[in-house]
């Protein structure tokens, strides 16, 4: 964050990094919204970038090893940014919600790079998560998202675009089917850019704005569904 501030010449801006795996962007939205609501700041810039190819395992010794780590083959690099500003329009507010399931804190973790496993190359990749655990928590996540929308009095049909963590096309469509969301209303871009983790959401939002699918000041509603290692579910809803 300090480097971004320096390169932008934003010398008066307070800045800090936010880390929450694939949910870092939604976490940043929540923090930015709280800052703006407090009246302490009027404008917040959120930047999100990922270099995920560093964690892809390229060398395999046997078929079993491929089956253990092939989820990393879908990783991709990318970055995006969003600028938030205070508004007097009561119809353009933001709501966010999180659920942390700390009993899964060690699932889907890349252990290498820290002080514990600095020089162990086998720790610089991520092992696949147990399919039964994934299925169980996909259903839990869907319930969390549904409850979050209900809490905000938002119906499925009220939303113009859904943006999710890009864990895979099959999983995204499975979530859409569970919540009865039309496939054309939910973003799938992992087939083009891979899973860019926390950068997925700002990339998707930017592409939708550039294509004309969304436009600022239109009153369109966007809902974001996040899922991150740890295990955390995140939700954000806002009107453009």
Where are these regions (language model features)?
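Short beta-strand segments
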Residues: 19, 43-50, 75, 84, ...
């Amino acid at each position: 964050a300090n480097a971004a501030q320096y390169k932008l010449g934003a010398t008066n801006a307070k800045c800090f990094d936010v880390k929450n795996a694939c949910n870092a962007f939604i976490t940043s939205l929540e923090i930015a919204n709280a800052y703006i609501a407090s009246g302490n700041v009027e404008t917040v810039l959120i930047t999100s970038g990922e270099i995920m190819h560093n964690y892809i395992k390229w060398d395999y010794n046997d078929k079993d090893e491929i089956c253990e780590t092939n989820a990393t083959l879908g990783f991709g690099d990318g970055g995006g940014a969003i600028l938030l500003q205070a508004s007097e329009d009561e119809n353009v507010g933001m709501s966010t919600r999180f659920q942390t399931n700390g009993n899964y804190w060690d699932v889907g973790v890349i252990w290498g790079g820290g002080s514990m496993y600095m020089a162990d190359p086998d720790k610089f990749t991520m092992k696949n998560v147990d399919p039964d655990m994934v299925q169980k928590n996909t259903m839990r996540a869907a319930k969390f998202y549904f409850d979050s929308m209900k809490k905000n009095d938002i119906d499925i049909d009220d939303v113009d675009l859904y943006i999710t963590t890009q864990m895979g096309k099959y999983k995204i469509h499975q979530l859409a089917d569970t919540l009865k969301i039309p496939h054309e209303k939910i973003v799938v871009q992992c087939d083009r850019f891979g899973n860019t983790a926390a950068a997925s959401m700002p990339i998707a939002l930017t592409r939708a704005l550039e294509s004309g699918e969304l436009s600022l000041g239109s009153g369109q509603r966007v809902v974001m569904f996040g899922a991150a290692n740890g295990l955390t579910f995140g939700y954000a809803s806002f009107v453009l």
